[in-house]
């Protein structure tokens, strides 16, 4: 019984302790629950504060942009009105001066005639006085006539003097009007500078260059980097536009004509049904080889068509960025064997490459060439292929190892299941039954995401704007930019919802773009070099098949990048083998019978060998050579005949000048842009 009582007592004690433990656990759980509730409330409050802050920031940016835009409109309007009024006044004064000069010429002619008549009358008077047979009446008449002519001559002289004074006054007024126009143009430039400064500050962009720092060298830098180059006349025209006008001219190219250079590719030819009945197999192979040869020829024609567009298009920035995106979204023809697909992709880059990166990225996930190249036509639910999903994040949008996880890569691939193409039409198709419609978690967000939603999620990630801004800056300006420079470009890109034109304008107006780190520091790729020679010299009737072959020998065959990461840039272009190929390619391009260097020089007021060498250096180089190298070029050219004899010696002179240009382009400075 005692044992039972002890056991009961122990059980009671255990129960009490258990109840206490349970009560403590309940209390702890309650406290945890309260803490979780409080934390959730804090998270909710933080999210609300973040949303409010973002809203306030957006409103502030919008207000600043509106204020900057208003100030820009007011200052620019008044400055332009003043400049236009001054220009009209100057034109009026110049017309008056021209009329005065014409009247002066007529009066001068009358004075000359009167003086001649006076001299003749004087001679007649002397003759009359000396004539013994002359009567007094005749003498008086002759004297009267002479006096009348003297009076007329004196009146004509007075009139000429008055007209000279009027002309002098008109010239003074013209000079004053010129000064007024220059002053008002300076006011206009100052207003444009102020507006650009306010706009950059409102967007958080790069500080702009002052218009006073704009010169010919910077105009050439702009036309080389935002395009491929240009003749001295084209560079001079850009310089005379001023900084803001030149940048607008390059960036707002949709106002320019479209290059009238057509290419009409055919889709991949497929065997006809009757070919299967041919005997022996050698006949079928012969037909297959014929189709392959036609496809290869078409691919070569596509490369030559694009080279011609780059060299002749009135929209050089459009073609320059088409080349950039072609390298960024790399696809190899040898893995596709489909020219039509690559033509479509090239047009995609041309259409969206200067407009909106988001639209371009959406185009890529629907692009038949990219889908086939990265095997997304084999990416189905329950049987996935991660190639496109991986490269979309690693190479095309965010950069390797920035802002995503391996889980995000796998989920991105699932979002792209069913994104396919029709092999016959070579167009995008969505296979709904092959698409994975289950929930996916990408960047921590859950949903039944597809390819279009994937692009939206990518664009929301901070790493995306930074990656795009960095790659464009390095391509257009210089390598290894400072982080704060990229930060500012990121602000502009995100403020414009990935619209690239505001970012490009901010970059091309910026101090960073015209810094010593940027000017004449970029080693041109083979295509940039060859197209630049064509544009710098204004070459006509170019054999683009030879240009294509030369670019290939120099290491850059269009539509055949070495891998999905594209070509290695800058110093990778310069090897012992490739540098020799570069010299030979440029020499062969320049040294053709129809390359008329004399025509490039005519009408420029050049007479001496030194002047010709200096002009061609400005034509071909972004960075001047040393004095010693310049002297070598002058010695190489030798003495020149007078310009009036150039046409008669055109053939011989062109041969000498072509050799000189080839020598200039073989200099190390010619490899830089």
Place the predicted regions along the sequence by residue.
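Surface-exposed interaction patches
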Residues: 320, 345, 369-370, 615, ...
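Flexible, low-complexity segments enriched for small/polar residues
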Residues: 210-214, 220-231, 461, 465-496, ...
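Active-site substrate-binding loop specific to GH73 endo-beta-N-acetylglucosaminidase modules
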Residues: 201-204, 285, 299-306, 338-541, ...
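N-terminal leader/transition segments
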Residues: 200-226, 230, 237-239, 243, ...
């Amino acid at each position: 019984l005692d044992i039972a009582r002890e056991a009961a007592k122990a059980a009671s004690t255990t129960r009490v302790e258990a109840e206490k433990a349970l009560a403590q656990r309940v209390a702890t759980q309650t406290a945890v629950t309260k803490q979780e509730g409080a934390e959730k409330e804090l998270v909710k409050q933080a999210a609300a504060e973040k949303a409010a802050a973002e809203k306030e920031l957006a409103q502030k940016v919008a207000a600043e942009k509106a204020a900057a835009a208003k100030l820009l409109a007011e200052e620019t309007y008044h400055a332009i009105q003043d400049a236009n009024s001054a220009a009209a006044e100057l034109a009026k004064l110049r017309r008056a001066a021209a009329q005065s000069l014409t009247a002066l010429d007529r009066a001068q002619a009358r004075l000359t005639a009167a003086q001649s008549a006076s001299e003749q009358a004087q001679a007649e008077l002397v003759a009359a006085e000396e004539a013994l047979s002359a009567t007094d009446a005749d003498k008086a008449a002759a004297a009267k006539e002479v006096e009348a002519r003297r009076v007329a001559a004196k009146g004509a002289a007075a009139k000429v003097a008055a007209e000279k004074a009027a002309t002098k006054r008109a010239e003074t007024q013209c000079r004053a009007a010129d000064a007024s126009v220059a002053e008002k143009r300076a006011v206009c430039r100052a207003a444009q500078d102020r507006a650009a400064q306010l706009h950059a500050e409102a967007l958080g962009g790069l500080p702009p260059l002052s218009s006073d720092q704009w010169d010919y060298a910077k105009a050439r830098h702009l036309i080389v980097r935002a395009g491929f180059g240009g003749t001295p006349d084209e560079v001079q025209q850009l310089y005379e536009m001023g900084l803001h006008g030149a940048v607008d001219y390059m960036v707002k190219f949709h106002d320019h004509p479209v290059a009238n250079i057509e290419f009409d590719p055919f889709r991949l030819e497929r065997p006809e049904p009757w070919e299967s009945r041919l005997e022996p197999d050698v006949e079928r192979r012969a037909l297959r080889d014929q189709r392959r040869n036609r496809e290869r020829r078409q691919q070569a024609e596509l490369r030559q068509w694009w080279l011609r567009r780059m060299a002749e298009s009135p929209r050089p920035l459009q073609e320059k960025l088409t080349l950039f995106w072609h390298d960024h979204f790399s696809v190899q023809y040898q893995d596709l064997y489909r020219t039509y697909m690559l033509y479509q992709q090239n047009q995609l880059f041309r259409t969206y490459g200067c407009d909106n990166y988001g639209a371009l990225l959406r185009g890529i996930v629907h692009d038949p060439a990219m889908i086939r190249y990265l095997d997304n036509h084999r990416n189905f639910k329950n049987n996935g292929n991660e190639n496109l999903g991986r490269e979309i994040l690693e190479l095309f949008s965010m950069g390797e190892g920035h802002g995503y996880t391996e889980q995000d890569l796998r989920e991105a691939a699932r979002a792209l299941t069913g994104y396919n193409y029709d092999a016959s039409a070579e167009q995008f198709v969505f296979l709904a039954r092959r698409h994975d419609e289950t929930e996916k978690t990408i960047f921590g967000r859950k949903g039944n995401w597809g390819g279009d939603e994937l692009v939206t999620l990518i664009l929301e990630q901070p790493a995306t704007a930074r990656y795009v801004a960095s790659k464009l800056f390095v391509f257009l300006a210089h390598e290894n930019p400072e982080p704060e420079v990229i930060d500012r470009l990121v602000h502009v890109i995100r403020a414009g919802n990935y619209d690239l034109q505001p970012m490009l304008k901010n970059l091309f107006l910026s101090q960073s773009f015209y810094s010593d780190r940027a000017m004449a520091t970029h080693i041109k790729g083979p295509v940039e070099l060859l197209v630049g020679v064509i544009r710098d010299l204004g070459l006509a009737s170019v054999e683009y098949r030879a240009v294509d072959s030369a670019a290939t020998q120099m290491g850059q065959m269009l539509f055949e990048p070495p891998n999905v990461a594209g070509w290695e840039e800058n110093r990778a272009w310069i090897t012992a083998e490739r540098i020799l190929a570069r010299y030979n390619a440029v020499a062969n391009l320049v040294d053709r019978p129809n390359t008329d260097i004399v025509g490039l020089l005519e009408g420029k007021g050049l007479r001496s060998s030194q002047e010709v060498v200096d002009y061609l250096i400005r034509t071909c180089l972004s960075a001047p050579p040393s004095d010693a190298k310049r002297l070598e070029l002058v010695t190489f050219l030798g003495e020149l005949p007078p310009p009036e004899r150039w046409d008669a010696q055109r053939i011989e002179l062109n041969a000498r000048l072509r050799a000189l240009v080839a020598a200039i382009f073989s200099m190390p400075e010619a490899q830089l842009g």
